[in-house]
Amino acid sequence: MSSNLSPTLNSGDKVKDGSIKEDRPYKIFFRDLFLFKENEMEAKKTEKLMNHNMKVYQKTTFSSRMKSRSYLSQLAFYPKRGGRSFEKFGPGPAPISRFLEGSDTKRTVHEFINDQRDRFLLEYALSTKRNTIKKFEKDIAMRERQLKKAEKKLQDDALAFEEFLRENDQRSVDALKLAAQETINKLQMTAELKKASMEVQAVKSEIAKTEFLLKEYMKYGFFLLQLSPKHWQIQQALKRAQASKSKANIILPKILARLSLHSSKKEGILEEFGGTAILSEDASRERDSQGKPSRILTRTSEKIKSNLTESFGSEDSLEFLLDDEMDFDLEPALYFKEPEELLQVLRELEEQNLTLFQYSQDVDENLEEVNKREKVIQDKTNSNIEFLLEQEEMLKANCVREEEKAAELQLRSRLFSFGEFNSDAQEILIDSLSKKITEVYKVCIGDAEDDGLNPIQKLVKVESRLVELCDLIESIPRENVEAIERMKQKERRQKFRDEKMREKQRHQEERLKAALEKAVAQPKKKLGRRLVYHSKPPSANKQQLPLVNETKTKAQEEEYFFT
């Protein structure tokens, strides 16, 4: 049979089948596990459909079908595979039954070919399933090996991780112990530092207290030194200078320099101190060369005594002895042996202070009186200056006023001499001016002094009266003048408003009158175009314009000068 099946599959078909498998973009895994179930469900479905379409006499029962299939239980292929049946690998039992019937039945070639084809398909399916099973077994074995390796590696990793955790715990415990020890050491160090800082602060406070007491005692000592006589102070200074022989050539020039600075106001003493400084320098040179400084020191001390007793007071002794570089190895000496001596000196100083206070009070009183006098004189001078400035301003204003009057009179004279006037017109103008002057005179002065005065005299009196009134206005308080000015301005504004209202009312009346006339008048009828010239000649009334301007200027001048 194998020889008969061999022509069905050639090498070309195998290559084609292999190429098709290679061209597939997917792989089928574990599909044959559910093949039996799918075939069984398909068979049931087809059987159900067939039974549904069959007649009643054509249908069979399950027992009859099982009886017809009972002979298949006697068949078994491949007993080495564990007695697996052939049903789940093949398309059905019909070809197998026909194959087992043997040569007893007569079959056609077509049936034989179909049987061979079915057999080949079964063998091919079996070989495919075996290969797949082998492949799956290899995969399972490989996966089991991988799982074992992974499990072993996981166990190793778990052991390493546990070891790492143990080491980490041990390190953390050691670190905590070290941190606790460091914290304890830090706290101990902090406590020691705090204790040391407290000790330093205590020492500093003690030093400050001691320095304060030392300053107080030095102040008292300097005070007592100031109260002591000058010759005793000089003796103590010389003793200190003689005690420090190694620094004698440094201290004495400093003392002499201080003496020269304090006595710079006295020229004769400066020259003597210069000689003593030279002597001290010569003494230092001789001491370096011969080693005999005692004679020169005594000579300079006598010179300093004689000069200090003549030139220095008690206020210079403190700065004379206050030198930072001087040594105070000697015990401090006091001039006052008994408290009564110090009290006596203090009483004398108190009396001197009282006399000085009295003298300063007298000087202050005299100074206050002098300041008061100076202030009064200054006020008088300022008032006189202000009065003179006011007089100056007044004179300037009068000058300006007179200049304006002169300009106005000059303008009037030009006005009277302007144009061609005849004598009658001048007489009429003079009469009108005299009448206006008389009216102004009556308003300003009155009717009592109107007898026998010409207009010029009346103008002089009116002018003098105006000057008096201007002076009186200047003497009136500024507040009253401002109040009167405000009243006048208010009256002017009220008058201007009234005039404006009257003008407005007049314009309204004129507009109303024009409107009434326009309403009453008969409407004009336009009878055609208005006839016009082709060219209109210019008007010949140009000569009237200057006359109108002259009349306007004359009217303005008369209104300005005579109203």
Curated annotation (Swiss-Prot):
Task: Establish whether keyword Cytoplasm is in the entry.
Answer: yes
Please tell me whether the keyword rRNA-binding is annotated for this protein. Answer: no
Residues forming coiled coils: 129-212, 384-415, 485-522
Location within or outside the cell: Cytoplasm, Cytoskeleton, Microtubule organizing center, Centrosome; Cytoplasm, Perinuclear region; Cell projection, Cilium, Flagellum; Cytoplasm, Cytoskeleton
- Major place of residence: cytoplasm
Keywords, in A-Z order: Cell projection, Cilium, Coiled coil, Cytoplasm, Cytoskeleton, Differentiation, Flagellum, Spermatogenesis
Residue ranges with Basic residues bias: 523-533
User: How does this chain assemble?
Assistant: Interacts with CCDC42, CFAP53, IFT88 and ODF2. Interacts with CCDC146. Interacts with TEKT3. Interacts with ubiquitinated histone H2A.
Gene for this protein?
CCDC38
Query: Biological process GO annotation list?
Result: acrosome assembly; sperm flagellum assembly
Matches recorded under PANTHER family: COILED-COIL DOMAIN-CONTAINING PROTEIN 38 (PTHR21683:SF7), COILED-COIL DOMAIN-CONTAINING PROTEIN 42 LIKE-2-LIKE-RELATED (PTHR21683)
Q: Write down what this protein is called.
A: Coiled-coil domain-containing protein 38
* Organism superkingdom: Eukaryota
Cellular component terms (Gene Ontology) = centrosome; motile cilium; perinuclear region of cytoplasm
